[in-house]
C-alpha cells in the first residue's frame, strides 16, 4: 500500500505541476506503527528524492477503512 500511495502522490504532484523534490512536509498515518513502520520506511527511502528529504511525521491512527494500512498528507510547493 505504501508504494501505491507514493505512486498516487507522484501522479497528483505532476498534475499540479510539481514533483517530489518540492515536497515540504509529509504526515504519515499507519494503522499499526509497530507492525508496518519498517516496511513503509524502506519503500519511502527508495522513493524519496536524494538530497530533498521533507519534514516528516509518522503516527499511528485508526484509518477510514479496515483494509487501509497507510495514508499520507503531503504539502508541496510549485517550482518557480
Where are these regions (language model features)?
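Short, polar/acidic, helix-capping and beta-turn segments at strand->helix junctions
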Residues: 1-80
Amino acid at each position: 500500500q505504501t508504494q501505491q500511495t507514493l505512486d498516487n502522490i507522484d501522479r497528483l504532484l505532476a498534475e499540479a505541476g510539481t514533483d517530489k523534490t518540492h515536497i515540504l512536509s509529509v504526515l504519515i498515518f499507519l494503522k499499526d506503527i509497530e507492525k508496518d513502520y519498517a516496511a513503509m520506511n524502506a519503500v519511502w527511502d527508495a522513493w524519496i528524492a536524494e538530497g530533498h528529504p521533507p519534514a516528516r511525521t509518522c503516527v499511528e491512527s485508526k484509518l477510514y477503512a479496515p483494509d487501509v494500512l497507510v495514508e499520507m498528507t503531503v504539502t508541496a510547493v510549485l517550482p518557480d
